[in-house]
Amino acid sequence: MPAVIQPHCITDPLTQSNCYILTAESHALIIDPNCYQEIHSYLANHQLVPEYIILTHEHCDHIAALNDMRKNYDLKVLCSAACSQGIQSTTLNMTRIMETYLYFKSQGELRVSYPPFICQAADIVFDDIYLATWRSHAIFCIAAPGHTPGSICIIIDEKILFSGDYFIPGEEVITRLPGGDEAVYEQQGKATLRCLPTPILTYPGHGGHFILTQEVKKEYGLY
């Protein structure tokens, strides 16, 4: 059995999005690259070679460092087909409205420049489910549309869950941002979230990690 992965979390001070770096045999797998310089420094300090990036969804706070990572490292990007489409659009990846979004979310306290950008299509895409092995670790990705068309959940070794922008501590599921669809979430996204194993150590796209239990699911109406 491979050693239990202990993800390293990098939180973007601007958007509070979480990037996770998983390591195995001096190699790295990165989930939702957000801050290039911090990721690069961590990889260099720990002498890690990044091999893959997995995206939980297409919003810009979860892909902000994707272009720089591709420019400076030889790696592959994995995400859902819908996410791959979304990262190529300034509307779907939210960069077109990000300055305004951050301004209103901060109640007028935050004025920042957030130039729109797009990314190239992912190297590996899937529609519903993707199974793979990375450095002896089992990777299971499953589509969970609703927050965005391309949202997914990721389970590693049946032990840890990366939930993207679902199960953010203290927040309801948001479907009002670009690409969000309440009806799709009710019909498809919830079906995926209901089926996730419990209890399981969970690392969300924002906020701290926690144990996902049936009780937590019930708080989100997942009966």
Each language-model region and where it sits:
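Short Pro/Gly-enriched beta-strand edge/turn motifs at strand-loop
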Residues: 1-6, 110-114, 134-137
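Conserved beta-strand hairpin/beta-sheet module of binuclear metal-dependent hydrolase folds
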Residues: 2-46, 153-164
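A structural micro-motif
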Residues: 5, 48, 75, 137-139, ...
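Small/polar loops that bind or transfer phosphate-bearing groups
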Residues: 10, 30-32, 55, 79, ...
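Short Gly/Pro-enriched turn/cap motifs at secondary-structure boundaries
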Residues: 10-12, 121-123, 142-145
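Short, basic/glycine-rich phosphate-binding loops at helix/coil junctions
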Residues: 18-24, 105-110, 167-168
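Metallo-beta-lactamase
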Residues: 28, 131, 138-223
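Active-site HxH/HxHxD metal-binding segment of metal-dependent hydrolases
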Residues: 36, 44-132, 218-221
